[in-house]
Amino acid sequence: MEALLEGIQNRGHGGGFLTSCEAELQELMKQIDIMVAHKKSEWEGRTHALETCLKIREQELKSLRSQLDVTHKEVGMLHQQVEEHEKIKQEMTMEYKQELKKLHEELGILKRSYEKLQKKQMREFRGNTKNHREDRSEIERLTAKIEEFRQKSLDWEKQRLIYQQQVSSLEAQRKALAEQSEIIQAQLANRKQKLESVELSSQSEIQHLSSKLERANDTICANELEIERLTMRVNDLVGTSMTVLQEQQQKEEKLRESEKLLEALQEEKRELKAALQSQENLIHEARIQKEKLQEKVKATDTQHAVEAIRPREESPAEKKYTSQGQGDLDSVLFQLNFTHTSEDLLQAEVTRLEGSLESVSATCKQLSQELMEKYEELKRMEAHNNEYKAEIKKLKEQILQGEQSYSSALEGMKMEISHLTQELHQRDITIASTKGSSSDMEKRLRAEMQKAEDKAVEHKEILDQLESLKLENRHLSEMVMKLELGLHECSLPVSPLGSIATRFLEEEELRSHHILERLDAHIEELKRESEKTVRQFTALK
């Protein structure tokens, strides 16, 4: 396109000025370049924004996974603490049981030793009354010792009861911790399921957005290639049309010059024919006069022969008559010679005029042949012009097909928006049902809602991009219409065939205007529908 603009500028500088068609074409090419560059930068910015959004989503998923790992670690630590408490309680119960067993054994030993002492004392009391006081003091000592052991036994029993209460409290605490662990495990399993479902939905949405981004990039590339192809095709058509118009103008000028030359040659031919006819008339008159003179010469010859036969005796009157006849004969011979010379001159002039007439006739035939060839070439140029018209019509049909594809893409976007609104509604219901679970889950769901709204905004931006593509196609249609108008303004009909071609081109222009008006109406209807859909979506939000 830039090469075409440079070629047009060079041609304009070489010619000293740019025509209106070339200036308008240059302006249109600049506008197309600006539009393509603007759309390319806009699409690159939106692609970068979508990529950053996907990166943020992946980072959030990583943070959720790290939080889930932390909660798993906390649950493992709680399990370890519960197991340690159970081990400690079991060890304490075993120690308490061993101590009680030892106390029971010591108590049994003391009871047996007390019984033995009682028996021994009874035997000694019966056998020996002397040591009664010593035995009594010994008995009191043993009784005090027994009381001490009984007190210790009571203390140990109290301590055993305290230990048993501690064991029961530890058992209740263990049960409470086990129940709490089960509740936490259930909550973690529920949260894990929710996180897995959210992760799956997020992955599916990421895949969907990635595929949509790829499709959008493919559509952008295809649209850019199509725009470049159409632009190149329009440039080629404009260049060929301009060259054809220039050739047509040159050939029409040559045709006019040939017609003028042919008319001049025909006029010269008519003049030569008139001169030839006059010369032929003169020759005919000279021939008639020659015949008359020849008859007179014959008459004088016969008269001279008669006079030679007559006798020589003549009268003076006859001699005078004879001399007069001789003078008449000389004058007749002179006229006859003059007539011969004039006849020869006229014959040479006639020969020259016939040669010039033949050359003029050959020139006329050659010019007529060239004129027929130029008419045929003009017809071929008209056929090429019709082909260019058909090509422009095909380009319009392609633009219409592009609009239809954009409308189908718009319908797909509408379906996607309705699906997203349903998902948002379902997520609102889910958020309302699971609102009292925990603040962390509520924050995550709010983040999901924000992400869904961001996706809705992205869809709205995609709709805006489709609208801008429609405007760009409309600009392309206007450019094609302006190019056709420029072609019609640049055409200079100079012959009846050129006027017929001009009328045909004007009819084709009116038909193309009608098609473009219908196309603009269709684009406006699509625009209203897209705006209505966006308003409905914003109202649902």
From Swiss-Prot:
Locate the coiled-coil region(s) and give their ranges: 22-199, 242-305, 346-485, 514-541
PTM remark: Polyubiquitinated via 'Lys-48'-linked ubiquitin, leading to its degradation. Deubiquitinated by USP36, promoting its stabilization.
* Keyword list, A-Z: Acetylation, Cell cycle, Cell division, Coiled coil, Cytoplasm, Cytoskeleton, DNA damage, Mitosis, Phosphoprotein, Ubl conjugation
* Superkingdom assignment: Eukaryota
Residues that the record marks as modified (Phosphoserine) are S278
Which residues are recorded with the post-translational modification N-acetylmethionine? Answer: M1
Major location category of this protein: cytoplasm
> Gene3D superfamilies in the record, alphabetically?
1.20.5.340
Q: Positions of the region Disordered? A: 294-324
- GO BP terms: cell division; centriole replication; de novo centriole assembly involved in multi-ciliated epithelial cell differentiation; DNA damage checkpoint signaling; negative regulation of protein K63-linked ubiquitination; protein stabilization; signal transduction in response to DNA damage; spindle assembly
Recorded GO CC terms: centriolar satellite; centriole; centrosome; cytoplasm; spindle pole
| Residue ranges with Basic and acidic residues bias | 307-321
Location comes to: Cytoplasm, Cytoskeleton, Microtubule organizing center, Centrosome; Cytoplasm, Cytoskeleton, Microtubule organizing center, Centrosome, Centriole; Cytoplasm, Cytoskeleton, Microtubule organizing center, Centrosome, Centriolar satellite
User: What protein family does this chain belong to?
Assistant: Belongs to the CEP63 family.
Task: Report the protein's function.
Answer: Required for normal spindle assembly. Plays a key role in mother-centriole-dependent centriole duplication; the function seems also to involve CEP152, CDK5RAP2 and WDR62 through a stepwise assembled complex at the centrosome that recruits CDK2 required for centriole duplication. Reported to be required for centrosomal recruitment of CEP152; however, this function has been questioned. Also recruits CDK1 to centrosomes. Plays a role in DNA damage response.
Q: How does it assemble?
A: Interacts with CEP152 and CDK1; these interactions recruit both ligands to centrosomes. Interacts with CDK2, CDK5RAP2, WDR62, CEP90, KIAA0753/moonraker and CCDC14. CEP63, CDK5RAP2, CEP152, WDR62 are proposed to form a stepwise assembled complex at the centrosome forming a ring near parental centrioles. Interacts with CCDC57; the interaction is required for their location to proximal end of centrioles. Interacts with FXR1; promoting its stabilization.
Report what the protein is called.
Centrosomal protein of 63 kDa
